[in-house]
Amino acid sequence: MNCSKIIPPILRLPAKTFALGVLSLSAFADAAIEEIIVTSDFRDTALLETPASVTVFDSVVIAQRQARHLEQVLNLAPNVNFSSGASRGRFIQIRGIGERSQFIEPLNPSVGTLVDGIDFTGIAGAATTMDIQQIEILRGPQGTLYGANALAGLINLRSNQPTEQPQGNMQISLGDYDTRTVSAALGGPVNDSLGYRVAMQKHSSDGYMVNDFLNRDDTNDIDELSLRTILDWQANQQLDFKLILFHVDADNGYDAFSLDNTRHTLSDTPGHDRHKATAMAVESRWQDAEN
């Protein structure tokens, strides 16, 4: 008689498992999933609706990687590779197509690089991640929108835009090899129709190479300054204008080769990788009043 009241443990396990499953589904249902918007198609499109193979990295991923340059994020994307040939990765390949160096064909970049709509194709050394909101990597031909420079794909960097409320941040970081980074950004409204955002970043490092011939440890150094200003003018309810000013000044060393593949070199005349660029862009958008 007593044996008939004993419930085997195996009968209780499915009930507990089912209860846990219900709780998990409920938790997922309550959690809001943020929608990712892609801007590379000249219009804001949800990632799931974009007719291309796209990888998007937001500011959270960039911060987690402590990335100061595009090259420090590219290796997270599938089917994307890059080579340096200088202090920074500037030759990018998507699905095996693209420049490998400045001396090997094809000399056509094939992979477009845009920073806030400004074309830096072939000179991706200027693509710092200063105040970047997200990085979009489009795999496959994008020639219809961007021409011959995007036959293999496109990399689009979009910075943080002016906000309706005052907003700012500042970061100071220190690291090994005398690495120092100072960055700051400030934005907000000027009046009801005009907004602004300014950002700067100064990044320097001695590098991890030691030149035994010259008895120096800074021949592969990094010294980069980036500045950006965005003015956003809402002319009326349908028409919007943006003025984008961008400046980058890089004076980096280049002393990376050694016969025994160590961090020690014997170069008597180390190289330099200097890059200075100033760019401006004007962007306008019209939105139909019915939308």
Residue map of PLM features:
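Short acidic/polar hinge/loop motifs at secondary-structure boundaries
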Residues: 102-103, 110-141
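N-terminal periplasmic "start-of-domain" segments of outer-membrane beta-barrel proteins
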Residues: 34-65, 73, 90-93, 110-111
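Transmembrane beta-barrel architecture of outer-membrane proteins
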Residues: 65, 89, 110, 152, ...
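N-terminal periplasmic accessory domains that precede
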Residues: 70-71, 91-93, 114, 137, ...
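Extracytoplasmic beta-strand/coil segments of soluble accessory domains associated
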Residues: 71, 75-118
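Extracytoplasmic loops and strand-loop junctions of Gram-negative outer membrane beta-barrel proteins
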Residues: 137-138, 166-169, 210-215, 262-268
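Transmembrane beta-barrel wall of Gram-negative outer-membrane proteins
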Residues: 167-169, 174-205, 209-252, 278
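Non-catalytic regulatory/gating segments with a bias toward low-complexity or hydrophobic composition
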Residues: 54, 62, 74, 135-140, ...
